[in-house]
Curated annotation (Swiss-Prot):
Gene3D superfamilies in UniProt: Jelly Rolls (2.60.120.10)
GO biological process: inositol catabolic process
Name recorded for this polypeptide: 5-deoxy-glucuronate isomerase
Coiled coil: none
Species in which this protein is naturally found: Shouchella clausii (strain KSM-K16)
Metabolic or biological pathway, per its Swiss-Prot or TrEMBL entry: Polyol metabolism; myo-inositol degradation into acetyl-CoA; acetyl-CoA from myo-inositol: step 4/7
Length: 271
């Protein structure tokens, strides 16, 4: 297994709180993005102080209460499974904040981090405020939930999005990249993918590769895996009979998502 595919490594932090993923602890080759996934039982409490990072808490499933000492967001979360395909609630917290997350049911939260040196207001990102977008055509269709797009000034660095891809389709396709700080043509953004698959015994394929091929890994990605994209193209293919969900976290020196398609495959857009 290459260094870009991360399997769940569960660690019980306290009673009722289990750390499932932690890219920083696994020494992922990233400078701007960090990602954790935490399972929380009902009435259990996860707590953290952010330091020099901002954080977006995404309620992947279940319900929780989030507080930062000034704000209390009670019983947030909208779904028992991501494959209900409806937006969820999230909370943005700026650097220097301390927060707690209390399970009001059995829940799973994603903690999406990026460096930040400017404090911004804590904000509840309601499911009803999440932009919904259908992208692509033919076998390149996907449903997108824009939690923190670059048009939303809630965050300093973070970009957060959920993508649903149905059976037999591709996403992040044609292959695109955002690994050069060359605005207005392309921005440099690192990225993580947290994957879920329905039904859960399935898998998807993801290839991460640069133009020089100094990075070139093709992975069979299973339910609950994380894929690291430090640079390069990163398409995802979904086999027949299965559906794909992934949560993307992106960040870089400038908070703009400007990508460039691989020229060899850009022709598919003109069909």
């Amino acid at each position: 297994m290459g260094q870009l595919l991360k399997k769940p490594k569960t660690k019980v932090l306290k009673q009722g709180v289990t750390l499932v993923h932690d890219t920083e602890a696994e020494k992922a080759p990233l400078k701007y993005v960090s990602f954790k996934l935490v399972d929380i039982q009902a009435n259990a409490i996860y707590e953290e102080t952010l330091g020099s990072y901002e954080c977006c808490i995404v309620v992947v499933r279940g319900t929780v209460t989030v507080t930062d000492g000034e704000h209390v967001f009670s019983n947030i979360g909208t779904r028992s499974s991501v494959f209900e395909r409806k937006p969820t609630d999230s909370v943005y917290l700026s650097n220097g904040r301390s927060f707690t997350v209390t399970g009001t049911s059995e829940a799973c939260i994603a903690l999406c981090y990026a460096p930040s040196n400017k404090q911004l207001p804590t904000k509840l990102i309601k499911a009803s405020d999440v932009g919904i977008e259908n992208r692509g055509q033919l076998q390149n269709k996907r449903l997108v939930h824009n939690i923190l797009p670059d048009s939303d000034k809630t965050a300093n660095s973070l970009l957060v999005v959920e993508v649903f891809t149905e059976s037999g389709n591709w996403s992040s396709y044609p292959p695109h990249k955002h690994d050069e700080d060359n605005l207005p043509y392309e921005s440099f953004l690192e990225e993580t993918y947290y994957h879920e698959i329905d039904p859960p015994q399935g898998f998807v394929f993801q290839r991460v590769y640069t133009e020089s091929r100094n990075i070139d890994e093709t992975m069979a990605v299973e339910n609950g895996d994380v894929v690291i994209v430090p640079a390069g193209y990163h398409p995802v293919g979904v086999p027949d009979g299965y559906a794909s969900y992934y949560l993307n976290v992106m960040a870089g020196p400038v908070r703009i998502w400007k990508f460039r398609n691989e020229k060899d495959h850009e022709w598919i857009l003109s069909r």
